[in-house]
Amino acid sequence: MAIFAEAETWVAIAFVILMGIFAYLGVHRTVLKALDNRRDRIKAELDEARKLKDEAAKLLADYRARRAQAEREAEAIVASAKADAERIAAESKAKLEDFVVRRTKTAESKIALAEAQALADVRAAAAEAAVSAAAIVLSQSVKGQVADDLLGKGIQEVRSKLN
């Protein structure tokens, strides 16, 4: 009976008895049930994680599509604004050039009018001077009624020719 003197034998006997008690009490069913529950919970968590991952992927794709659309719209707006700015600049330049041309024509016409007026004033002053000189010369050289008649006719004739 040396076999019963060994500690390992008693550990093995105790283990077999303990397993028998566990089998009698149905502990193995409880352990299996707990493992099954844990497996189901892990599977549900994995399914939920997979579903969340799919939703996140869809949201990411949607976000990228919206961002791309927004970038295209922004580029279109910028292009439209540039085109509008160029068009407005061209219109403004054309209007400014037209304004300068009109102002130049107005200034030229005013200058021409002033030149014509100055020329007319000079001619009138020259005519007055000629008439006055002729009147003085005639009055000093001719005397009497004949002188007055000649003087009047001469002044009238000079005025009509010079004006």
Curated annotation (Swiss-Prot):
Enumerate the transmembrane spans.
7-27
Protein purpose: F(1)F(0) ATP synthase produces ATP from ADP in the presence of a proton or sodium gradient. F-type ATPases consist of two structural domains, F(1) containing the extramembraneous catalytic core and F(0) containing the membrane proton channel, linked together by a central stalk and a peripheral stalk. During catalysis, ATP synthesis in the catalytic domain of F(1) is coupled via a rotary mechanism of the central stalk subunits to proton translocation.
Give the main location.
membrane
Subunit structure comment from the entry: F-type ATPases have 2 components, F(1) - the catalytic core - and F(0) - the membrane proton channel. F(1) has five subunits: alpha(3), beta(3), gamma(1), delta(1), epsilon(1). F(0) has three main subunits: a(1), b(2) and c(10-14). The alpha and beta chains form an alternating ring which encloses part of the gamma chain. F(1) is attached to F(0) by a central stalk formed by the gamma and epsilon chains, while a peripheral stalk is formed by the delta and b chains.
Family recorded in the similarity comment: Belongs to the ATPase B chain family.
- Topologically, how does it sit relative to the membrane? Single-pass membrane protein
**Intracellular or extracellular location(s):** Cell inner membrane
Tell me the lineage of the source organism.
Answer: Bacteria, Pseudomonadati, Pseudomonadota, Alphaproteobacteria, Hyphomicrobiales
The answer on whether this UniProt entry bears the keyword Cell inner membrane reads yes
Any one of the GO CC terms: plasma membrane
Give an example GO molecular function: proton-transporting ATP synthase activity, rotational mechanism
- Is Chaperone among this UniProt entry's keywords? no
CDD domains, sorted: ATP-synt_Fo_b (cd06503)
Task: Give all cystine bridges in this chain.
Answer: none
Pfam families noted in UniProt:
ATP-synt_B
Protein name per Swiss-Prot or TrEMBL: ATP synthase subunit b 1
Record key words, sorted: ATP synthesis, Cell inner membrane, Cell membrane, CF(0), Hydrogen ion transport, Ion transport, Membrane, Transmembrane, Transmembrane helix, Transport
